[in-house]
Amino acid sequence: MSKQPNILLITTDQQRYDTIAAMGYDYMYTPNLDRLVREGCSFPNAYSPNPVCMAARHNIITGLPARYHGFDDNYFDDNPKVIPYDLPTFPQLLSDAGYDTIAVGKMHFQPYRRHNGITKLELMDEIPRHRQDDEYALYLKEHGYGDIQSIHGVRHLLYMLPQRSMLPEELHGSSWVSHRSIHHIKENAGKRPFFLWSSFIAPHPPFDVPDQWADLYKGKELPPLKVSTTPLSALAEENKNIADYPTEAYLRRARELYFASISFVDYNIGKILQRLEDMGEYDNTLIIFTSDHGEMLGDYGTYQKFLPYDSSARVPLIVRYPEVFKGGEVDRRFVDLNDILPTVLDAAGVAYPNPAILPGESVLKKSGFKDRTKQYVEHAHGSRRWASIRNGQYKYTYYYGGGKEELFDMINDPDETTNLLAAQETCECLRQSFPSESVSAVREELHAALVEQEKRYGLEGYVKNDELVVLDEMQPFFYRENNPPMFPKEQDEDFVSLEEEVRRAIAKEEVVKLSELDVPYFTKSGTLSEKKLKK
C-alpha cells in the first residue's frame, strides 16, 4: 500500500468465539466472515478485557482499561460517568491526522452522543430514549414504521425468548448498518483516507431475525451445552435468572435464532465488503472484525455476559491487511480488544501520545513488548468484581466477594466444567490426576501473576500489601430484563401497544405460548396489561 489505508472496524454485539465456520465451527453459515479468514489472519485466542458492552467499547476506543476511562461495567442514563476529556481516543487521533472518521450503529457511549473524535456519527441504540437522537429510529419513521417502539425486538417479557422482527428484512437494524456503511464508503472512496466503524447490535438479544432467516438453523445439529460439575460462583447463579425458558424447546429455539442472527449479520457484512471492492478500495483497507464480548447462551444454565468463562469472555477476531498477512494465517497468541487501538494507529502511521501506559500492542507486529503468553480479564467493582488470568493451560479467576476462586485446565477441560479448586475436595479421581500440591502450585503461580496485573491495570484499591483484598460476599438479586419501550408519548400518538407488539413478535414462533410465560412478573410495573395481552 503506497498511501495511508482506509480502516474498517466491524463489530457485532455479544457474539461468541465459536460462531465462524472457517475458524472450526462448521455448524455455522458465515460465508463472508469465512472469506476474511481465508484472506487475512484469524486469532482464535482473542478475549474481551471486560466482557460487558459499555466497558469493552470504551477499552476499544481508548486502548485502556477501566482504571483510566472509568467504565468497569454498564452504566445508564442517570449516571454522570464520562471518559476524562484529556484521554485520547483513536478516532480523535485519526481525525487529527487527516482521516475522515465515521461510525454507524451501536456505540454505547456516555453521554449518548459524545463523538469521541468521530466526525460523522449515525446512531442505532438498543433502547433509544428519544427518536430525534437516533438516526435509525428516524429512518424507520421516514419509511412508515414510526409506530413501532420495540425496533430491535421486544425486550419486555420476551427478552431472551424466541421472536421475530416486526420489520421487513430491508429495514432491519442489521440491514441499516450495511446500507449506511455502503453510503459512506461511496461518499469517501478516492478522497482522503477514512475510518469507518460499522457496529451491529446483533446478535445481542432479543434475537429478532427477519422471517427469511428465522429457520436457517431449525432442526440442525447444534453444539451441546456446557455443563458444570462443580458449584458455580454467586454471580453465575444470579445470572441464571435472566432467561425464563418454560421448556427446553424454548432454549433450543432461542439458540437457533441467535445463530441465525449472526448469519444475517454476515450477509450484510458481505454487502459492505462488496462495495469496497466495487470502489477499488478493498486492498487499501485494514479490515478488523470482532465483538465486544460473548454470550453464555445456556452454558451452565447461564445467559448473557459479564462472566469469566470463555462463552462470555472469548470473542472472534479477524484482521485482513494484505500488506502484512498473506491470507489464511492463524495467530494463536493471546490478543484482546485493547490491541485494536495500537493496531489501527500502527497501520495509519499515527503515534499515541503516551504509549508506555497502553496494555495492548499492534497485532500487525509478530513480536513486541506485550507478554502474549498470558491473558488478563476484569469486570465490575465492589463485591461483584472479579479478575481472571490464564496461560497456555490454566485459567484462574478471583471473585472479590468472599475471596472465592476458580481454576480450570483449559487443555484437558476446555469447556470449563470442573473447577479444580472445588473438585479437589470432593472427587477422588481428580485428586489422583491432579495431586493437591500440583493444583496448589498452579494456583499460587497464577494468583501471583493476577496480583501484578491488578496492581498495574486493575481498579485502584483492590490490592493491599501485595495481596488481593477480600470483600463481603456478593448478595445475588433476582434479575430479569424489564425494559418496556421508552419513547415519550408526545413523540408520536399512534404507537402500536406493547401488548400488540408482543403478539406480533411471537405470532410465527410456534414454540412460544403466552400461557407458559411469566406474564404477572412483567405487569407489576403497570406497563403491560395481562388482560389486553390475552384478549
Specify the residue positions occupied by each region the protein language model found.
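Active-site regions of oxyanion-processing enzymes, predominantly non-cytosolic
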Residues: 2-7, 112-131, 167, 173-228, ...
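Histidine-centered active-site microenvironments of extracellular/periplasmic hydrolases
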Residues: 28, 206-212, 274-326, 336
